[in-house]
UniProtKB/Swiss-Prot annotation:
Alphabetized PANTHER family for the sequence: ATP SYNTHASE GAMMA CHAIN, ATP SYNTHASE SUBUNIT GAMMA, MITOCHONDRIAL
The name this protein goes by in its record: ATP synthase gamma chain
SUPFAM superfamilies reported in the protein's UniProt record: ATP synthase (F1-ATPase), gamma subunit
GO cellular component, as recorded: plasma membrane; proton-transporting ATP synthase complex
Coiled-coil segments: none
Alphabetical list of CDD domains matching this protein: F1-ATPase_gamma
Subunit details: F-type ATPases have 2 components, CF(1) - the catalytic core - and CF(0) - the membrane proton channel. CF(1) has five subunits: alpha(3), beta(3), gamma(1), delta(1), epsilon(1). CF(0) has three main subunits: a, b and c.
Family annotation (Pfam families): ATP-synt
Species assigned in the record: Shewanella frigidimarina (strain NCIMB 400)
Primary location recorded for the protein, binned into one broad class: membrane
Location of the protein in the cell: Cell inner membrane
Length: 286
């Protein structure tokens, strides 16, 4: 058994760790609230943009934009949004598992794959994963702006425009609630058509002054908005996961301190008993 002094040192160490995890939990809770506000503010725009694009994809257009044409999938691109930092439970691991599983299906069909990781953990993973990394972004902070992502996104759009990509997906953790964050893969290009409800009431738009000019701008902005929303959702998911992970770590530290305190008390009691025994033995010898 370890000495009482060693156990006391260990208790002090665990208490220090507990203070750190408790502070990180409170910081994550504060950041999560702000991230939720940003997510709630941008989500209606992203959802309505998706609906508009769904109608466009269903319509009969005089100008057929390349983003509306379905090509044979010979090369698939993924924009994978993960975190810059760790200590957020299995958030990144679950996301990467989903990507790897989807990549495996495409490779079985003979398609090549390339990645655009966003977030330091994503960059690190896919550089070691072995796939081609066409562009990447990290260090966006807790409140990224659309301008921070445009350059990275347009690298992938350029590849699609040049026929170097036939599919483009975005992967991120969708914020459901504080306890639940779900990794999702959403198709960006070619544009996914609307669901059955919307498709049952189709209509066409009239584009003025020029369909090509309007659609070029609209569809590019659509992709950018979906990537931005994915990043914002992932940040909210990250802070929620970190808050939960740090709370669990704080609770576990408390349990460990209680267990160590019992061991310390036993060690101290054993030491006192031994000292008393030695005193009694010494007195008897005299």
């Amino acid at each position: 058994m370890a000495s009482a002094k060693e156990i006391k040192t260990k208790i002090a160490s665990v208490k220090n760790t507990q203070k750190i995890t408790s502070a990180m939990e409170m910081v994550a809770a504060s950041k999560m609230r702000r991230a939720q506000e940003r997510m709630a503010a941008s989500r209606p725009y992203a959802e309505n943009m998706r609906k508009v694009i769904g109608h466009v994809a269903q319509g009969t257009l005089e100008y057929k934009h390349p983003y509306l044409e379905v090509r044979d999938a010979k090369r698939v691109g993924y924009i994978v949004v993960a975190t810059d930092r760790g200590l957020c439970g299995g958030l990144n691991v679950n996301l990467f598992k989903k990507v790897v599983s989807d990549v495996k299906k495409w490779k079985e069909q003979g398609a090549d794959v390339e990645f655009c990781p966003i977030g330091a953990r994503s960059v690190q993973f896919f550089k070691s994963f072995g796939g081609e990394v066409s562009a990447h972004a990290s260090g966006l902070g807790d409140a990224p702006k659309l301008a921070d992502l445009i350059g990275t996104v347009r690298v992938m759009l350029k590849a699609y425009n040049e026929g170097k990509l036939d599919r483009l997906y975005i992967v991120f953790n969708k914020f459901v609630n504080t306890m639940t964050q779900t990794p999702v893969i959403e198709q960006l290009l070619p544009l996914p058509k609307s669901d059955e409800e919307v498709a049952s009431y189709p209509w066409d738009y009239i584009y003025e002054p020029d369909p090509k000019e309007v659609l070029d701008l609209l569809l590019t902005r659509y992709v950018e908005s979906q990537v931005y929303q994915g990043v914002v959702e992932n940040i909210a998911s990250e802070q929620a996961a970190r808050m939960v992970a740090m709370k669990a770590a704080t609770d576990n530290a408390g349990e460990m301190i209680d267990d160590l305190q019992l061991v310390y008390n036993k060690a101290r009691q054993a030491a006192i008993t031994q000292e008393l025994s030695e005193i009694v033995s010494g007195a008897a010898a005299v």
